[in-house]
Amino acid sequence: MQFSKMHGLGNDFMVVDVVTQNVYLSPTKIRFLANRHSGVGFDQLLFVEPPYDPEIDFHYRIFNADGSEVTQCGNGARCLAHFVRMKKLTNKREIYISTQTSRMVLTIIENNMVRVNMGVPKFELPQIPFDMHQIEKKEILYLAKNYIFGGIVSIGNPHCIMIVNNVDSAQVSIIGPILEIHKYFSERTNVGFMQVINREQVLLRVYERGVGETQACGSGACAAVAIGIRLGLLAEQVQVALPGGKLVIYWRGPGQSLYMTGPAVHIYDGFIND
């Protein structure tokens, strides 16, 4: 099995071409490969598959380091765009992909920068999914004392955003796993901790479900900005600084698609003899 190791702002991936290769990896095998001591080491495994729709160029599957399959990864989408061009699976600069829950348009700009149309953020509780009505704010604030509950949103995957005064001292490793598996999130959730610097700049740390805290989370950056704009705290275009680097997020508001721009980096190619 041939693969590429890639990263987007330090959020690292093992990317596999399943268009020209026949590949199946069990959850146990994925966990083994994800191990940074005995395997390849990665936050997520990405499968690039043939499309299921004539209007789509590729189907995109994402597996977390714990072997669970998830429905969205913004940093991974940028790496996918770089990967399919690099491997000559397409010569397009605008690439249409599908996931289990959404469709995205990836536009390769220059110098390995990629702009991703992440679709329209969803705030309706059943679409997140979030199985509670009316009292979610009180319950979440009880779990995450000394934080301001920003909101919950789906960017193709669920996110809970907390607003903090100082992102460096945020208890990401404590609050993150508590909220990730909270009973009201039927599919678990990603948890973002956002510090607002001004209307055009935020600092963000993200605890990703099935992974833990990562250097960057593209969909998490999108979720944080969408929540911030909805609360009237942020402008339409915002620079999000994560531990691994910066993303630019643009959203005009309800009913509009949200856009993320950032880098995609190829590290090396490898081969695993099964």
Swiss-Prot record:
InterPro entries: DAP_epimerase_AS, DAP_epimerase_DapF
Record flagged with keyword Isomerase: yes
Chain positions of site Important for dimerization: 268
A GO term for molecular function: diaminopimelate epimerase activity
Signal peptide extent: none
Biological process annotations from GO: lysine biosynthetic process via diaminopimelate
Entry keyword set: Amino-acid biosynthesis, Cytoplasm, Isomerase, Lysine biosynthesis
Chief location: cytoplasm
Compartment list: Cytoplasm
Annotated positions for site Could be important to modulate the pK values of the two catalytic cysteine residues: 159, 208
Pathway entry: Amino-acid biosynthesis; L-lysine biosynthesis via DAP pathway; DL-2,6-diaminopimelate from LL-2,6-diaminopimelate: step 1/1
Active site (record annotation): 73, 217
A GO cellular component annotation in the UniProt record: cytosol
Top-rank taxon, per record: Bacteria
Enzyme Commission number, as recorded: 5.1.1.7
Catalytic activity: (2S,6S)-2,6-diaminopimelate = meso-2,6-diaminopimelate
Residues given in the record as substrate binding sites: 11, 44, 64, 74-75, 157, 190, 208-209, 218-219
Subunit structure: Homodimer.
Role summary: Catalyzes the stereoinversion of LL-2,6-diaminopimelate (L,L-DAP) to meso-diaminopimelate (meso-DAP), a precursor of L-lysine and an essential component of the bacterial peptidoglycan.
Entry similarity comment: Belongs to the diaminopimelate epimerase family.
Protein name as annotated: Diaminopimelate epimerase
Organism of this sequence: Baumannia cicadellinicola subsp. Homalodisca coagulata
Lineage: Bacteria, Pseudomonadati, Pseudomonadota, Gammaproteobacteria, Candidatus Palibaumannia
